[in-house]
From Swiss-Prot:
<dbReference type="InterPro" id="IPR036714">
    <property type="entry name" value="SDH_sf"/>
</dbReference>
<dbReference type="InterPro" id="IPR005631">
    <property type="entry name" value="SDH"/>
</dbReference>
<dbReference type="GO" id="GO:0006105">
    <property type="term" value="P:succinate metabolic process"/>
</dbReference>
<keyword id="KW-0963">Cytoplasm</keyword>
<comment type="function">
    <text>An FAD assembly protein, which accelerates covalent attachment of the cofactor into other proteins. Plays an essential role in the assembly of succinate dehydrogenase (SDH, respiratory complex II), an enzyme complex that is a component of both the tricarboxylic acid cycle and the electron transport chain, and which couples the oxidation of succinate to fumarate with the reduction of ubiquinone (coenzyme Q) to ubiquinol. Required for flavinylation (covalent attachment of FAD) of the flavoprotein subunit SdhA of SDH and other flavinylated proteins as well.</text>
</comment>
<comment type="subunit">
    <text>Monomer.</text>
</comment>
<dbReference type="Pfam" id="PF03937">
    <property type="entry name" value="Sdh5"/>
</dbReference>
<comment type="similarity">
    <text>Belongs to the SdhE FAD assembly factor family.</text>
</comment>
<dbReference type="GO" id="GO:0005737">
    <property type="term" value="C:cytoplasm"/>
</dbReference>
<protein>
    <recommendedName>
        <fullName>FAD assembly factor SdhE</fullName>
    </recommendedName>
</protein>
<keyword id="KW-0143">Chaperone</keyword>
<dbReference type="InterPro" id="IPR050531">
    <property type="entry name" value="SdhE_FAD_assembly_factor"/>
</dbReference>
Length: 88
């Protein structure tokens, strides 16, 4: 997926679990443009993960084996925590 195709990435952020939508969509909407191209590539790669894996990682019930994905999960958690609750 092209890191500059924001419409497609936005669609990929929409998941089958509300808990994931609450974590991923605000991060995309508020933070994606400020990421480096490399971070954008990693974020897009993270979106290719299965919902149960994403849920477990974002809820701290495990972590990805891939160090880059683990770093992106931590970044999502940190930025969401700093920003606070966002209405969906």
């Amino acid at each position: 997926m092209d890191i500059h195709n924001k419409a497609r990435i936005h669609w990929a952020c929409r998941r089958g679990m509300r808990e994931l939508d609450i974590s991923i969509m605000p991060f995309f909407e508020h933070e994606y443009d400020s990421l480096s191209d490399e971070e954008k590539r990693i974020f897009v790669r993270l979106l290719q993960s299965d919902d149960p894996d994403l849920f477990n990682w974002l809820m701290n019930h495990g972590k990805p084996a891939d160090a880059e994905l683990e770093q992106m999960v931590r970044l999502i958690q940190t930025r969401n925590r700093e920003r606070g609750p966002v209405a969906i």
